[in-house]
Regions:
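Flexible, non-catalytic linker and terminal segments flanking ANL/adenylate-forming cores
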Residues: 1-22
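AMP-dependent adenylate-forming
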Residues: 3-6, 27-50
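Short, flexible loop segments at the rims of nucleotide/cofactor-binding pockets, characterized by
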Residues: 17-21, 53, 101-103
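Conserved AMP-binding/adenylate-forming core of the ANL superfamily
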Residues: 21, 38-83, 87-91, 108-113
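Hydrophobic alpha-helical segments typical of transmembrane helices
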Residues: 24, 28-29, 61, 111, ...
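Conserved, well-structured beta-alpha core segment at the onset of a catalytic domain
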Residues: 25-26, 43-44, 76, 94, ...
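Generic recognition of well-ordered alpha-helical segments
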Residues: 27, 56, 60-63, 95, ...
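Structural core segment of the AMP-binding/adenylate-forming
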Residues: 67-68, 95-152
Length: 152
């Protein structure tokens, strides 16, 4: 099978990664951010983010999450479509030492409440467009202590 996505890789980005070189996904992420600091990491809706920007923003988000006083291994849910905020949240959660709970932004309030309760998520990161669903589900999500709302 032809790996057509490789044509999109910038010069110097390896086609394969030796996973034995890294002790964790966070280590791989940190080293990639340093190595490709000025390269584009993500592009969405006409806006690009470099690895350096992703590094800085995800670190700030990790610090914010830790300042909430969550214990190591706490669950943090992400209720976002494919936006630049998603990788910032994802890598911020990992860097803080927490567990990611991906959730569907199109869930009904009952589906969301079930997943949050079942997973034990304490934090929910959500796009403002879906805040009404969260508000409706909130009484049925006793584990959720913090909600982080982002905008388009």
């Amino acid at each position: 099978m032809e790996k057509i996505w490789l044509k999109q890789y910038e010069k110097g980005v390896p086609a394969e990664i030796n996973i034995d070189e890294y002790t964790s996904l966070v280590q791989l992420f940190n080293e990639s951010c340093k190595k490709f600091q000025t390269s584009t990491a993500y592009t969405n809706m006409g806006t690009s983010m470099s690895y350096g920007e992703l590094d800085a923003l995800s670190l700030k988000f990790a610090i914010y999450l830790q300042q909430l006083g969550l214990k190591p291994g706490a669950r943090v849910a992400i209720m976002l479509p494919n936006l630049l905020q998603y990788p910032v949240a994802l890598f911020g959660i990992l860097r803080a030492g927490y567990i990611i709970v991906n959730t569907n932004p199109l869930y009904t309030s009952d589906e969301l409440a079930y997943q949050m309760t079942d997973s034990g998520a304490e934090v929910l990161v959500v796009l403002a467009n879906f805040a009404a669903t969260v508000e409706s589900a909130l009484p049925k999500m006793p584990t959720v202590k913090h909600i982080v709302i982002t905008q388009l």
